[in-house]
Amino acid sequence: MAPGDKKQIIFVITTIGRPSSTVVPFKNLEVSEWSYKKGIKNGYDDYRDPPSPKPLPKSKQEPNADDKVGDIEYDEMVSVRDGYYSDVCRLTCTEDTKIFIADHISLWRYIMDNAEKLPNYVVIMEDDNTITGEGFITNLDNITKVLNDNNVDILQLVTHTKLLKDRNSQHLMLLPDLEAFKGSFDVSLSAYIIRQEAVRKLYSYFTNNKPSFDISLEILRIENTLGITRYVVDNDRYVYHDYKLANEFMKNKKNRLSIKSRIDGWIMDNWPSFYHRMYYPLFSVFGKYDITMMFLIAIVIIIGLAIFDINNKLLWLLSGVFLAYSM
């Protein structure tokens, strides 16, 4: 099959459980759902070790601390997933970050294994995004041609901030109403188009240097070294990241009925992007306690009160309430 004859495909990574038909509501091309668990079932992982001999049964055998990750049973899925990131990440990354790393790296492996069947540029989206304009689908070949002609390796379809684009660089007109700027610090793998050559570079790097943090941050550090050119679209006219969907999923996982959860719900409904930034776990302590931006702000306030020797009891009370609320 000639390269030009390869049909476009969109990979939808399962993060919150939305049907792929709602992520891509148009039937113009093939959509394939993905998660690292699917990769394990299909054998697309490098981390499956030969089964070790089972020990002889012992009476009153003490539980092994290595058999658990936090409160999660250390089963085969978790064992294989742990192979995608470093031991540091295993202790400090949140559960969402670990799944995120495994989902993307396992999909990159699948793309490499099926390179001959797939187009040069592949679309990858997490399922808290929605393609809102059919023009993106019908013009996908034209968009990838612009990317190829300008030697762009990654096109971010979503950015969480519009202030960090390098607007002094050459901008690309992808469509009459959609342009892209060279990416700066706004790295996001929520939705992106990636060239197969970039997939190979990233996969090779992360298998030899297992990530200790969110791979979005790792890419920011290594993209120039790997020679990867990344651009970011300047609007959400065609691909929309819905913070409310991600926030609702995060809220349902907590499943708490309290005044705090009602306040959280009100903030989530009125300022979804603010809620996502403040409440989304940044890292974890020993894989058990998630640390958010809200918690860090509360700690900084308390440290500031202590450093400047503030004796106002009301301020200390309010900062204590804020700290308790952030936990």
Curated annotation (Swiss-Prot):
Residues 59-69 have a biased composition (Basic and acidic residues). Residues 41-69 are annotated as: Disordered. Coiled coil: none annotated. The chain crosses the membrane at residues 291-311. GO terms for cellular component: membrane; viral envelope; virion membrane. It comes from the Viruses. Belongs to the poxviruses protein p35 family. Envelope protein that binds to the cell surface to provide virion attachment to target cell. This is Immunodominant envelope protein p35.
